[in-house]
């Protein structure tokens, strides 16, 4: 979990193995707007950790509403703030523990510019008359419940063939 708080710095928290001890973090995080990129991808994982935002600002949706040709975080930071983000670790294996120092640095850099990006996107959305649209979209994503379990089509075919489990296929 990557956290950047104005005046407090950047924090990286690996919740693996401490999922049941994140209550104090949840209490602190329940007081501020969360700035996320592609919130609909992050929130389900954060909900599994009992982390719920009181308000969301999704930079990806902001980019869509502003008609940006590319809406990756890297593209938006370059277009709006004029900085290039290194993305050489985006396809790394994040399941290996402990995380390598290079991966930790990469994860921290991902959130370093989110406050500035939010501020500039907010100004742009206000000028375009679309800030309220963003608020509505972000609230819908924030309130969205957990995703239903993925359909596993092999189960239906397996039942018809008398197969009891996936391994028997």
Language-model features, listed with the residues they occupy:
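Short beta-strands and strand-loop turn motifs
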Residues: 56-57, 88, 115
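A short, charged helix-loop
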Residues: 75-103
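Short, flexible segments with low predicted structural confidence
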Residues: 48-49, 85-86, 144
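Mixed-charge, glycine-rich, non-catalytic linkers/tails in nucleic-acid processing enzymes
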Residues: 101-169
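Hydrophobic/aromatic-lined pockets within catalytic cores
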Residues: 51, 66-67, 81, 85, ...
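Conserved RNase H-like, two-metal-ion catalytic cores of nucleic-acid enzymes
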Residues: 1-75, 79
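Secondary-structure transition/capping residues
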Residues: 73, 87-88, 125, 132
């Amino acid at each position: 979990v990557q956290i950047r708080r104005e005046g407090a710095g950047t924090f990286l928290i690996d919740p693996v193995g401490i999922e049941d001890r994140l209550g104090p973090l949840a209490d602190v995080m329940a007081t501020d707007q969360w700035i996320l990129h592609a919130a609909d991808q992050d929130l389900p994982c954060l909900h599994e950790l009992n982390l719920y935002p009181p308000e969301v600002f999704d930079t990806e949706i902001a980019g869509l509403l502003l008609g940006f040709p590319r809406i990756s975080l890297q593209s938006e930071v370059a277009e709006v703030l004029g900085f290039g983000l290194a993305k050489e670790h985006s396809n790394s294996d994040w399941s290996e523990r402990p995380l390598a120092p290079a991966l930790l640095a990469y994860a921290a850099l991902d959130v370093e510019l989110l406050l500035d990006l939010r501020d500039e996107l907010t100004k742009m959305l206000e000028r375009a008359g679309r800030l309220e649209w963003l608020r509505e979209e972000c609230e819908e994503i924030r309130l969205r419940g957990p995703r239903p379990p993925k359909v596993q089509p092999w189960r239906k075919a397996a039942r018809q063939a008398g197969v009891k489990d996936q391994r028997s296929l």
